[in-house]
Regions:
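N-terminal signal peptide c-region/cleavage motif recognized by signal peptidases
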Residues: 25-26
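Sec-dependent signal peptide recognition
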Residues: 11-22
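Cleavable N-terminal signal peptides
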Residues: 18-19, 29-31
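N-terminal secretory signal peptides that target proteins for export/translocation
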Residues: 1-11
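Transmembrane beta-barrel domains of Gram-negative outer membranes and organellar outer membranes
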Residues: 30-245
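Alpha-helical and His/Cys-centered functional microenvironments
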Residues: 6, 15, 117
Length: 245
């Protein structure tokens, strides 16, 4: 309609492979690669996703690769690998993580909710963790959608802080067209669930993002987050590439 030319399938493949290569060249001080996960599970869903984030102040990259597949219309499994390279050039895998999504509602419900259970394993004596997380999603209209996620994480191991750590994330999304959605996202890390940190020690980030459903199962995501206090990077740029099968 506006003379825009979609990238070819070959161009998307090459772009995806190029981003994939960053997985082994990421700075260890990685930025926020998290998302506001939905409670929705779609039967027959399978996808591969690569995420890259950049803190322009330090040049630090965060990278993550995951594969997910639904078992039915209620349960989905996801596997994640996160790798990095230190300032001295030492490459390592930071962690691997397994996730189970449990959708508690029907596809026709406007109000959806569900759980996500996480198990994260780290090497080199670093603490591993488990999480029990809850997500809520409400479709206000065919165009507008609101989402909230709360995460409760407990670490274990010799160096672990055994307090249950609390996070909250939210997203307001507007579907501008069949291909494009515009979002406003918020992320916070508040501290121990029974004793929140003071504001100056909490982490709060907010910013816009856009989802572009391109073609042939490809989706591109781009956006940035800005800090609401001095405990997070001033700005973090984020890009995700997803291929559904």
């Amino acid at each position: 309609m506006y003379g825009c030319k979609y990238p070819s399938f070959t161009q998307l493949i090459n772009t995806f492979i190029a981003y994939l290569g960053l997985l082994t060249f990421s700075n260890s001080t990685w930025a926020n690669t998290a998302g506001v996960f939905p409670p929705v599970v779609q039967e027959g869903h399978r996808s591969l996703q690569y995420r890259v984030t950049l803190n322009p102040d330090t040049g630090a990259f965060g990278t993550r690769l995951h594969y997910q597949e639904s078992l039915n219309d209620d349960v989905m499994l996801r596997g994640i690998v996160h790798a990095s390279e230190s300032a001295t050039g030492h490459s390592k895998v930071d962690f691997v993580q397994a996730e189970l999504f449990w959708d508690l509602d029907e596809d026709t419900d406007r109000l959806r909710h569900g759980f996500r259970f996480d198990a994260r394993a780290r090497g080199r004596g670093e603490p591993s963790s488990v999480s029990v997380n809850y997500a809520l999603q409400y479709s206000v209209s065919p165009q507008w959608q609101a989402r909230l996620a709360v995460l409760n994480t407990r670490s274990f191991g010799d160096k672990a802080n055994t307090d249950i750590q609390f996070q909250a994330r939210s997203q307001l999304s507007y579907r501008a067209s069949q291909a494009v959605s515009l979002n406003l996202e918020y992320y916070s890390q508040l501290g121990a669930i029974d004793n929140f940190n003071p504001w100056k020690n909490q982490k709060h980030q907010i910013g816009p993002s856009v989802n572009w459903r391109v073609a042939n199962g490809w989706t591109l995501y781009g956006g940035f987050l800005s800090s609401m206090n001095n405990s997070s990077p001033d700005t973090v740029y984020r890009m995700w590439v997803t291929k559904a099968f």
